[in-house]
C-alpha cells in the first residue's frame, strides 16, 4: 500500500499549501485595477499543478477513519474483491458508480480506485472553471478548492462530490449548440447514476433554464425558511416518502439515536447565514449595480433552488450532505460577479481580494473548530 503522508497530516498540508496560494492570489488581486481583475488573463499553471497534486496525494491516501466514509467504501471494495457481493445490474440504484467499483475491484487495489474517483472529482472542476471564465479560471478554481466542503467531499461523501462535479461541468455546456446540450445531458445522466440526489441540482438547472427571474428566486428562498420553521418535519417526511433516493430518505427520517452518530440536527442558523452570502452578493450585483449575464443567472438560479430545498429539510439528520447539493456551487456564485463585472465602484481589486481571503479564512476556521 502506498503511503505518501500519514493520515493525520493531510489536512495540515492541504491548508499550508492553500494558505500560500491564497496569499499569492490575494496580493495579485489587491494590486490589480478594476480592468486588470476582469480582463487580464491569469496563468492557470499554478492552480492546475495544485489540482494535480491534490488528485495524486488525496487519491492515494491511506485507508483511515480520518477520511470518513473512505473506510466504508474500502470495506465494500474488499468484499467485491473477495467475491462476497453480486455484480451490479442496471436496475440497481447508482449503477454507474457501482459498476465502476465492481470493475476496478477485479484489476486494481483500492487506493487506485480512490485515485480514479479523485480524478473524476477534481478534473471536471478544473475544466468547468476554465470554460466559465478563461481569464480568471485560476481564481475561480482557488475559490472552489478552498471552500470548506471541498476536502470533505473528496474523501468522505465521494459519490456526492463526484456527481456534483459532473453537474457543475454540465452547466457550462447547456448554453452551447446541439452537441453541447447532448454533452450536458450525458453528464447529468452520469451524475444521476453516480448519486441519485444529484437530481436536485439537475432539476434546478432545468428550472433555471426555463425560468430566470431573480426576484422570484429570492422570494422562493425566503419562503423556504418559513416553510422549514412552520412545517419542516412534515416537509421532510413528504420528500422521504417520494423515495427517489433511498440514502437521502434514510437521512431525512433517521431517528435521534442514529443522528447522534452524524451531524447535529435542528434548524441550522449557522448554515443558513453561510448560505446567504452568495445571495447578498447577487442582490448587490443584480439589483443594485444592474450587472448580470446568462451564466451568472444560471449559476444563481441553480444555487438558490437547490439551497431552498435544503432549507426545507434543514432539521434532518446529516443536513450537511443535503447542503452540499447547493454548496458545491457556492464558491463560484460568490466569485463570478466580482471577476466578470466591475462590481465594486472603488478599490475593486482590493475588495475582491478581501472576499477571497475571507472565504479561505472561514474554511480554515471551520477546520480549527472541528467542523
Regions found by a protein language model. Give the residues of each.
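Alpha-helical transmembrane segments and terminal signal-anchor/GPI-anchor hydrophobic tails
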Residues: 66, 71-75, 204-320, 368
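Short hydrophobic/aromatic helix or loop-helix immediately within or flanking a transmembrane segment
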Residues: 71-82, 86-109
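Transmembrane-helix motifs of polytopic, lipid-linked glycan transferases
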Residues: 116-133
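Transmembrane-helix signature of polytopic, membrane-embedded enzymes
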Residues: 129-147
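Short acidic/glycine- and proline-prone juxtamembrane loop motifs at membrane-interface regions
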Residues: 154-161
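Membrane-interface transmembrane helices that cradle and orient dolichyl/undecaprenyl
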Residues: 167-182
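Transmembrane-embedded, aromatic-rich helix segments that form part
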Residues: 185, 197-208
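Signature aromatic-anchored transmembrane alpha helix within multi-pass, membrane-resident enzymes
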Residues: 222, 342-365
Amino acid at each position: 500500500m502506498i503511503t505518501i503522508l500519514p493520515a493525520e497530516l493531510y489536512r495540515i498540508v492541504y491548508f499550508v499549501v492553500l494558505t500560500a496560494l491564497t496569499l499569492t492570489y490575494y496580493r495579485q488581486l489587491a494590486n490589480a485595477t478594476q480592468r486588470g481583475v476582469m480582463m487580464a488573463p491569469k496563468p492557470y499553471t499554478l492552480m492546475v499543478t495544485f489540482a494535480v497534486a491534490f488528485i495524486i496525494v488525496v487519491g492515494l491516501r491511506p485507508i483511515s477513519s480520518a477520511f470518513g466514509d473512505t473506510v466504508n467504501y474500502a470495506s465494500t471494495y474488499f468484499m467485491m474483491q473477495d467475491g462476497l457481493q453480486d455484480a451490479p445490474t442496471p436496475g440497481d440504484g447508482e449503477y454507474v458508480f457501482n459498476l465502476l467499483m465492481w470493475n476496478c475491484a477485479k484489476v486494481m487495489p483500492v487506493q487506485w480506485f480512490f485515485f480514479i474517483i479523485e480524478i473524476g472529482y477534481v478534473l471536471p472542476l478544473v475544466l468547468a472553471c476554465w470554460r466559465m471564465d478563461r481569464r480568471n479560471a485560476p481564481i475561480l478554481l482557488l475559490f472552489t478548492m478552498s471552500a470548506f466542503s471541498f476536502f470533505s467531499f473528496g474523501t468522505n461523501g465521494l459519490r456526492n462530490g463526484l456527481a456534483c462535479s459532473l453537474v457543475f461541468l454540465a452547466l457550462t455546456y447547456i448554453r452551447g449548440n446541439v452537441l453541447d446540450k447532448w454533452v450536458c445531458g450525458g453528464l447529468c445522466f452520469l451524475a444521476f447514476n453516480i448519486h441519485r440526489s444529484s437530481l436536485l441540482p439537475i432539476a434546478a438547472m432545468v428550472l433555471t433554464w426555463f425560468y430566470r427571474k431573480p426576484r422570484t428566486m429570492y422570494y422562493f428562498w425566503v419562503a423556504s425558511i418559513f416553510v422549514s420553521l412552520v412545517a419542516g418535519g412534515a416537509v421532510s417526511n413528504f420528500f422521504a416518502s417520494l423515495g427517489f433516493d433511498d440514502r437521502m430518505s434514510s437521512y431525512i427520517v433517521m431517528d435521534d439515536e442514529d443522528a447522534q452518530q452524524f451531524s447535529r440536527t435542528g434548524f441550522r442558523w449557522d448554515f443558513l447565514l453561510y448560505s446567504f452570502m452568495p445571495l447578498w452578493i447577487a442582490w448587490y450585483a443584480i439589483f443594485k449595480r444592474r450587472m448580470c449575464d446568462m451564466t451568472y443567472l444560471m449559476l444563481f438560479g441553480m444555487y438558490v433552488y437547490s439551497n431552498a430545498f435544503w432549507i426545507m429539510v434543514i432539521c434532518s439528520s446529516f443536513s450537511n450532505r443535503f447542503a452540499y447539493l447547493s454548496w458545491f456551487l457556492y464558491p463560484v456564485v460568490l466569485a463570478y460577479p466580482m471577476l466578470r463585472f466591475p462590481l465594486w465602484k472603488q478599490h475593486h481589486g482590493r475588495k475582491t481580494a478581501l472576499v477571497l481571503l475571507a472565504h479561505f479564512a472561514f474554511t480554515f476556521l471551520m477546520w480549527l473548530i472541528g467542523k
